[in-house]
Amino acid sequence: MKLKFKKQAYQTDATSAAVNLFAGQEKIASTFTVMEERQLSLLQNEYGYGNALLIDDKKMLENMQEVQRRFNLPLTNDIEDKRFCIDMETATGKTFVYTQTILELNRRYGFTKFIVVVPSVAIREGVKKSLDATKEYFSQA
């Protein structure tokens, strides 16, 4: 059985909110295996290697507050930890949204490293099934 996926406005809004946090970020053209030494120094911190964030905290705060205004959320000033949350109800397509967000972050900004944490083996297996089911859809997007 082949599933058909339909764009949902709330899912597109969630992806847009996450991606727009990084507005102004230059696209980094790199891969995990082939990097210039100059690029590696941009990615390294005390935790290891990650995506090179080239926008400053002030710009990220402006971006975050713009997203908050767009969705009528209370404005906050705390981006010190750079932890952002998109809350979605059960069975609303969270896996679809974060997969779409990952692909869009890669397309726009060249981000290539993502960590997805799930609370149990059962949910991990559900995520794997969802990724398998959406593989064709996202490869055509």
Predicted regions and their residues:
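RecA-like P-loop NTPase motor core of helicase/translocase proteins
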Residues: 1-141
